[in-house]
Swiss-Prot record:
Name of the protein described by the UniProt record: Otolin-1-A
Gene name, Swiss-Prot/TrEMBL: otol1a
Every C1q domain range: 351-488
First and last residue of the signal peptide: 1-23
Purpose: Collagen-like protein, which provides an organic scaffold for otoliths onto the sensory epithelium of the inner ear. Acts as a scaffold for biomineralization by sequestering calcium.
Length: 489
């Protein structure tokens, strides 16, 4: 766009210069410098008619700004131009001065350009309003003005949107303690706190009242079988149990002798029985003579049975007769019901616990013992019952029973053959075939029944006697009573 305007501006400049030169040629005389015209009266006085002369107050006395421009030169090079600028507030609103005002611009400061009006009117006459000129082209942008004064504060704006929450600030210092407020409403009971650490032990308190009887504790684990105690004193006889059911009827025993007892006393006369029925009359016989009594005839046949009368009341009991012979033993009856448990008997005497144990070791000076002899275990680890004889290096059995024996032997430089001996009989053997500077362990364990007076020891066989001991390696021999034999009281 600026490239297109450049030729147009150059052409317009040439036309203006040519027109100016022609106008200067037409002028015959040179006008002198123009003096400022008399100013119109102030707005409180009425406007004067054109052509009349009136006396006016100097513009400087009433705040009129007068400016004479000498440097401004128009296109006429021969004559100088002069202009006078007055404030529009000096003149009445009815005074028309729009002749020199550009179109679209309101009343304000105006300038009289005498170069364009000297052909039409004199300098002393105010110009008349002419027809509006054509709209001029848009001028170049003006120089940016200076910064204006700060205007009055505007009305408060609308409330802005809520901003995003800010970050947590640094914790401030602890403030002063405020005044105590009114007591608040009691809060809800909080949860039980965690158990605190144990505090220091307090002083012993006074003896309290005896507490209530506690609940019975849980049943303990069954204890080991103890040795049988001595027989306690017999308890009191328990209550008689209920009679058992009748046993099975035994077989009939042999008939016992029935000797006659002494005659009892005569019983009292019983009451007469009822009268029997009347019999049929017999056939009358003839009158015979009395004969001699004959011999007793045989017993006749029993007559017909008659109905037995009702028995009379029993008579008084007679004296007891003699005891008859015992009959045969009957079969065993059924088992009766269990009787009521008797009272607890008195506590018996406590049994004496029998103890026997030992544990011995080998000193380094006793390494590689001679074969066929008891190994010299002189290092006593446990021998409170003194059942181990360190002089003979043997265990003496004091209480008969079951024993447990074990040995742990360090083997070095030589092979080993060891045996557990009971009364000269080798009960247990161990072998370790080792040569050189290597170190090994040989061990064994056995459960044996011993009687009082038996002896037990450990020995090596032939030249296999690699039993070794040092400050860092031990060889030990141990035994203990598992349980003793029962003793008869």
């Amino acid at each position: 766009m600026p490239n297109i305007l450049h030729p147009f501006i150059i052409i317009m400049t040439l036309l203006v210069v040519a027109t100016g030169n022609q106008a200067s040629i037409d002028k015959t005389t040179q006008w002198p410098r123009m003096k400022p015209t008399k100013k119109p009266p102030p707005r409180d006085e009425g406007p004067s008619k054109l052509g009349s002369i009136s006396t006016t107050v100097s513009p400087t006395a009433i705040g009129i700004t007068e400016e004479v421009t000498d440097a401004m030169m128009d296109a006429y090079t021969i004559t100088s131009t002069g202009s006078t600028t007055f404030s529009s507030d000096t003149y009445s609103a009815d005074y028309h001065t729009e002749a020199m005002v550009p179109p679209g611009v309101g009343p304000g400061n105006y300038t009289l350009d005498y170069n364009e009006c000297f052909f039409n009117f004199c300098e002393c006459c105010p110009p008349e309003r002419g027809p509006p000129g054509p709209v001029g082209e848009k001028g170049l942008p003006g120089i940016p003005g200076g910064k204006g004064e700060m205007g009055p504060p505007g009305p408060p704006g609308q409330e802005g949107l809520t901003g995003a929450p800010g970050t947590h600030g640094v914790k401030g210092e602890k403030g002063d303690t405020g005044a105590s407020g009114l007591p608040g409403i009691p809060g809800v009971t909080g949860k039980q706190g965690e158990k605190g650490e144990s505090g220091p032990k307090g002083d012993k308190g006074d003896t309290g009242f005896p507490g209530l009887k506690g609940d019975p504790g849980e049943r303990g684990e069954p204890g080991w079988n103890g040795t049988k105690g001595g027989m306690g004193e017999p308890g009191k006889q328990g209550l008689t149990g209920p009679p058992g059911p009748d046993g099975i009827k035994g077989e009939k025993g042999d008939k016992g002798d029935c000797p006659f007892g002494e005659k009892g006393q005569k019983g009292s006369i019983g009451e007469p029985g009822p009268q029997g029925p009347k019999g049929d009359p017999g056939v009358p016989g003839t009158n015979g003579t009395d004969g001699l009594p004959g011999s007793k005839g045989p017993k006749g046949d029993p007559g017909p049975l008659s109905k037995q009368g009702e028995p009379g009341p029993p008579g008084p009991q007679g004296p007891p007769g003699q005891r008859g012979m015992p009959g045969m033993k009957g079969t065993r009856g059924l088992k009766g019901a269990r009787g009521i448990r008797g009272f607890k008997g008195f506590k018996g005497e406590p049994a004496v616990q029998k103890r026997s144990a030992f544990s011995v070791g080998l000193f380094p000076s006793r390494s590689f013992p001679p074969p066929g002899l008891p190994i010299r275990f002189d290092k006593i680890i446990y021998n409170e019952e003194a059942h181990w004889d360190p002089n003979a290096s043997k265990f003496n059995c004091t209480h008969g029973g079951v024993y447990v024996f074990s040995y742990y032997i360090t083997v070095r430089n030589r092979p080993l053959r060891a045996a557990l001996v009971v009364n000269g009989i080798r009960k247990l053997r161990t072998r370790d075939s080792l040569y050189g500077q290597d170190i090994d362990q040989a061990s064994n364990m056995a459960v044996l029944r011993l009687s009082s007076g038996d002896q037990v020891w450990l020995e090596t066989l032939r030249d296999w006697n690699g039993v070794y001991s040092s400050s860092e390696d031990d060889s030990t021999f141990s035994g203990f009573l598992l349980y003793a034999d029962a003793t008869k009281d």
